[in-house]
Amino acid sequence: RLSWELLVAYREAMAQAGIPKVDDFNRGDNEGCAFFEVNQRRGVRWNAAKGFLRPALNRPNLTVMTDALAQRVRLDGRRAAGVELVRGADAAFAAARIETILAAGAIGSPQILQLSGVGPPAALQPLGIPVAHALAGVGENLQDHLQLRMAFKVSNVLTLNQRANSLWGKAMMGLEYALFRTGPLTMPPSQLGGFTRSDPSHATANLEYHIQPLSLDKFGDPLHPFPAFTASVCNLRPTSRGQVRIKSADPRAHPAIMPRYLATPEDRKVAADALRLTRRIATQPALARYAPQEFKPGPDFRTDDGLAKAAGDIGTTIFHPVGTCKMGLATDRAAVVDSRLRVHGLERLRVVDASIMPTITSGNTNSPTLMIAERGSDLIRAERRRAG
C-alpha cells in the first residue's frame, strides 16, 4: 500500500476529533477511521467482470454480446418473452427460454422497463409508449450518497498535486506503474476513510469520509498547482428521493436523472453538521504543522442555511445510485420487485442489481450489489431445481 504522510496525520486528527482509530470497517460496527480495503490484485483494479464473468466465458451455456444495446423487453401479455436489441445496424431479438433478467443498474434497469411500457403511465403516455403494465414505482425512489468535497491548501508536505503537475512527476509515476505495478497509479484516490455520526442522536454512523491527498475543481479537471487535500464527506442515510425518467422512446437517448439532493430539511441539516465537523478535524494538533487552509467551499459559510447552500455547490455524486426498482410487498404501490426479485404483476422477469434496494446502504454499494447478485443467482438456481 502506498503511504502518504498527510493521510497518516489526518487519521491522527480524526482520532483527536473523537473518531477512533480502527483496523477493520467490517467488524460489525463501522464507526471509526482506517485505511480502506480495496478491490485490487497485483496493482490492478479487480472487478466483477474479472472475478465472475471472465472465468465463465468458455461455458457452453453462455454467450456474451458486446457493443449491443438492449432496447426493450418484449412482453407477450404479462409474460416476458425476451429482449429486443441492436448491434451496430442490425436489430435482433434474444428469446427467453425460461426468464429474462435485467441487471442494467439503478439507471439502466428502470430505463429499459419504461421503454418496454412498464412504469408510471404519466411518464410513458406523453412519449407515445403504450402502457403494457402500469407500475408506479419504476424509476422512483432514487437514492445516492452526495459527497461534499471540502478542499484545504497545505504546506510542508507532499500531495499528489505536486507529483501530477510536473512532467518529471508524471513520468516517474508512469514508470513505477509500468515496471513494478506500484505507486499512485495503483491506488484509488481515497485511501483513508472514516465513519462517524453528525450528532449524537444517531444510533450509528451516518457520515462517511473519503480523504484524498489531492484536490481539483471538478472531476475531469487537472489537479490544482499547489499542495492540497480533499476531505469528502457524505450522508449515508439521505431522506431525499429522486427519480429516473426516460425523455424519449428512442433507447439511445439518455434518461433524465433527477437525484433531488438536499431536498429535505433533514439532509440539509446533516450537510451543515458534516461541514462543521470537517472543519473541526482540520484544526486538530496532528495537522497543525501543515497549516491547512480551507478554500472549498471557503470559511465564510457559517450558518445552517449558508452551509447547506455551500453543500449544494461543492456536492457531487459518489456513484452509488440505488432504489429505482425497489423491493417490497405487492400492496406497496412504490414497489417494483418482490422478495425473489420478480417484477410485480409480470411473469418470467426479474431485476437483479442495486436498483432493488428499498433504502441505500450505510456505506459503499459495490459489495452489497455483489451480494444481491449472489442472492439472485441462488434464487434462480433454486427455482430451476424445483422445476426439474
Where are the model-predicted features located?
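Conserved redox-cofactor binding core of oxidoreductases
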Residues: R1-A80, R149-M173
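Alpha-helix capping and helix-loop boundary segments enriched in small/acidic/polar residues
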Residues: Q40-V44, L115, H133, N364
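Stable alpha-helical elements in mature extracytoplasmic
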Residues: L6, Y10, A48-F52, G108, ...
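Glycine-rich loop(s) and the adjacent beta-strand/alpha-helix scaffold that form part
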Residues: V73, R78, G82-M172
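Glycine-rich nucleotide phosphate-binding loop and flanking beta-alpha elements
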Residues: Q71-R72, I107-S109, R333, P358
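FAD-dependent oxidoreductase catalytic-site/capping-region signature
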Residues: R1-F36, S155-L158, M173-P368, G376-G388
